[in-house]
């Protein structure tokens, strides 16, 4: 099945003589939409996740980008998108997603008037003009107001003139500030006027006093999306846009910024805007909504007409902005990494190490789930049980990963916070990004070095095992008839006394030494009392972004590394490398004492402990 921009162009050409030749099969576009919807319901080739309240929706980037300019600007930079719950709920977004993939408004349990009014608000927020026009026609046929009304009436009444003017001032001020604050920014195409259409200037809702969405349509990526723009993450003072493609959960939307009055507002308008913002009730948390059933399961056939009259052929034809040019994205240049710049608490380890090594610089930890991972909508009520305690419900992260020695040591250094992590088998990588080894398919697990052949890997592994044996022998000579507990401590102790490599970097808390500052910083995080990276799903706290990202993969079921032989998928690349040896029958790890061979390095390490144990 074709899934990509080319497929969407075929779909958009249905019945359009100006974009391409007439189709031989008039139902081709419907069949294509049917296949795409079935892929979505099964989670096949889905490369973006939309989170609304407590619900998770999987979709395809190209389908969303072809349906909405708003989504088109978001999916270029984000793979995990949070929508504003004041503007769209999970139930309404379920209907919108079904409409995008099927062209039909599926039946709902809600009455007609609130349903279409809420849909109109959400469609205007997400910039779906066809759906907004359809909702207006439905409301007009029912005789319900959607664009005008008294100031105090409920429903879809138009805001009073003072609110519309203040709204236009806020939008213009924010838009101008974004353009002026960005280096080399082009001139804006056109500023919105106070007399714009209903869905361009202000977003009507069931509660007319909710002006928070009127002054700004907040992009989940941290920018202002009311003009179809989205922010682009910048590092420090650089103004370049980071464009990350592929399913990478390292990019996470920051918290929604509060709306601040612009310079064009009068004091009365500013007070009115502030009161209306604080008076807007928060959206109720809806139960999780699973992905809808496929088009065929919902009773629709490929030959049924779509609800969108006159727009069936182009409801997915928004791949490009007017004029054939893609709209430019705007991002704040002030999105910086701030969690390392907090004021130190009196008596904390931060204050004790003021003269020592500084915290990690921005960018040294690799890509993360955000500059500062917020306690999002899913983290409310799901935090730890105590100030630094464990979450009230356990996570099942280790079900797929296993509880092997190598990964336990890596997790203990970043999550345990006890300072007794094994420094001998700790990962040396700063970020969570998996290294592309190329032809070096034979990977040493503790140090993550790749080798092109098993012979070179064996020679490298010998340096690890010989050093370990030497440590154990020295410990046995010093302790005489010491027990197994003392020898285990020798194994986990730093190997500075037995190696020729200098270790000039010393921990200011526990006096351990390391050979490079990056490893020292990673170790020092285990002494920190704060864990600034929470999981937005279960509330578990982490000291590193990379560890939290791997943890979130277990919640979302993301396994990006697939085996070409059997199709089995894994969350980590080294797991896939180990799995491939099952198909090849290769056992690259050999014991130098008895000649036994193993497919995994941790099995060899356990085997060596059997040789060196006193029993």
UniProtKB/Swiss-Prot annotation:
Subcellular localization, as worded in the UniProt entry: Nucleus
GO terms under cellular component: nucleoplasm; nucleus; plasma membrane
Extent of Basic and acidic residues compositional bias: 336-356
InterPro entries: BTB/POZ_dom (IPR000210), SKP1/BTB/POZ_sf (IPR011333), Znf_C2H2_sf (IPR036236), Znf_C2H2_type (IPR013087)
Tissue specificity of this protein: Highest levels in cerebellum.
Region entry Disordered, spans: 144-167, 182-208, 229-421
Keyword Metal-binding: yes
Zinc finger annotations (C2H2-type) as residue ranges: 442-469, 505-532, 533-560, 561-588, 589-615
Region (Binding to CtBP): 246-250
Purpose: Transcriptional repressor.
Similarity comment: Belongs to the krueppel C2H2-type zinc-finger protein family. Hic subfamily.
Assembly and interaction partners: Self-associates. Interacts with HIC1.
Protein name per its UniProtKB record: Hypermethylated in cancer 2 protein
Species per Swiss-Prot/TrEMBL record: Homo sapiens
Lineage: Eukaryota, Metazoa, Chordata, Craniata, Vertebrata
Record gene name: HIC2
């Amino acid at each position: 099945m074709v899934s990509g921009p080319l497929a969407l162009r075929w779909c958009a050409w249905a019945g359009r003589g100006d974009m391409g030749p007439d189709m031989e099969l008039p139902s081709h576009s419907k069949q294509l939409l049917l296949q795409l919807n079935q892929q979505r319901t099964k989670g096949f080739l889905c490369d973006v996740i939309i989170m609304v309240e407590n619900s998770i929706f999987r979709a395809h980037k190209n389908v969303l980008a072809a349906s909405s300019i708003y989504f088109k600007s978001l999916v270029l930079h984000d793979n995990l998108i949070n929508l504003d719950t004041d503007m769209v709920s999970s139930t309404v977004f379920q209907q919108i997603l079904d409409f995008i993939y099927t062209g039909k408004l599926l039946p709902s349990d809600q009455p007609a008037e609130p349903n279409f009014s809420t849909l109109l608000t959400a469609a205007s927020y997400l910039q779906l003009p066809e759906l907004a026009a359809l909702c207006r026609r439905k409301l007009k046929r029912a005789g319900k107001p959607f664009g005008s009304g008294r100031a105090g009436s409920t429903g879809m009444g138009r805001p009073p003139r003072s609110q519309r003017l203040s709204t236009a001032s806020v939008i213009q001020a924010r838009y101008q500030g974004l353009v002026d604050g960005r280096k080399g920014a082009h001139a804006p195409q056109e500023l919105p006027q106070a007399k714009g259409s209903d869905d361009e200037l202000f977003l009507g809702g069931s509660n007319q006093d909710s002006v928070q969405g009127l002054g700004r349509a907040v992009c989940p990526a941290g920018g202002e999306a009311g003009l179809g723009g989205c922010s682009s993450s910048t590092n420090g003072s650089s103004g370049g846009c980071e464009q990350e493609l592929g399913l990478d959960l390292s990019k996470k939307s920051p918290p929604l910024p509060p709306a601040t009055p612009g310079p064009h507002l009068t004091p009365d308008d500013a007070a009115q805007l502030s009161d209306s913002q604080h008076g807007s009730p928060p959206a109720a948390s809806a139960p999780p909504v699973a992905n809808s059933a496929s088009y065929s399961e919902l009773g629709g056939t490929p030959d049924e007409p779509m609800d969108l009259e006159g727009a069936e052929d182009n409801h997915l034809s928004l791949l490009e902005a007017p004029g054939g040019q893609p709209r430019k994205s705007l991002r704040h240049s002030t999105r910086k990494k701030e969690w390392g710049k907090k004021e130190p608490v009196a008596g904390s380890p931060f204050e004790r190490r003021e003269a020592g090594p500084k915290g990690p610089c921005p960018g040294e930890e690799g890509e993360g789930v955000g500059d500062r991972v917020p306690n999002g909508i899913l983290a409310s009520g799901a935090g730890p049980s105590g100030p630094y305690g464990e979450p009230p419900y356990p996570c099942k992260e280790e079900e797929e990963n296993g509880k092997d020695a190598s990964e336990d040591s890596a997790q203990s250094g970043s999550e345990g916070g006890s300072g007794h992590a094994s420094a001998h088998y700790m990962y040396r990588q700063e970020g969570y990004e998996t290294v592309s080894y190329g032809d070096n398919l034979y990977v040493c697990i503790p140090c993550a070095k790749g080798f092109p052949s098993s012979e070179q890997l064996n020679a490298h592994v010998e340096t690890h095992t010989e050093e370990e044996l030497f440590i154990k022998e020295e410990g046995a000579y010093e302790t005489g008839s010491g027990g197994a507990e003392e020898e285990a401590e020798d194994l986990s102790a730093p190997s500075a006394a037995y190696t020729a490599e200098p270790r000039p970097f010393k921990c200011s808390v526990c006096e351990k030494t390391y050979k490079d500052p990056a490893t020292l910083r990673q170790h020092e995080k285990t002494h920190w009392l704060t864990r600034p990276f929470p999981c937005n799903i279960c509330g578990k706290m982490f000291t590193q972004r990379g560890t939290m990202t791997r943890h979130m993969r277990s919640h979302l079921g993301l396994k990006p590394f697939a085996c070409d032989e059997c199709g089995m998928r894994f969350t980590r690349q080294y797991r896939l490398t180990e799995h491939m040896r099952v198909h090849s029958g290769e056992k690259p790890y050999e014991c130098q004492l008895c000649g036994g061979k193993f497919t995994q390095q941790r099995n060899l390490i356990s085997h060596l402990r059997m040789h060196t144990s006193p029993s």
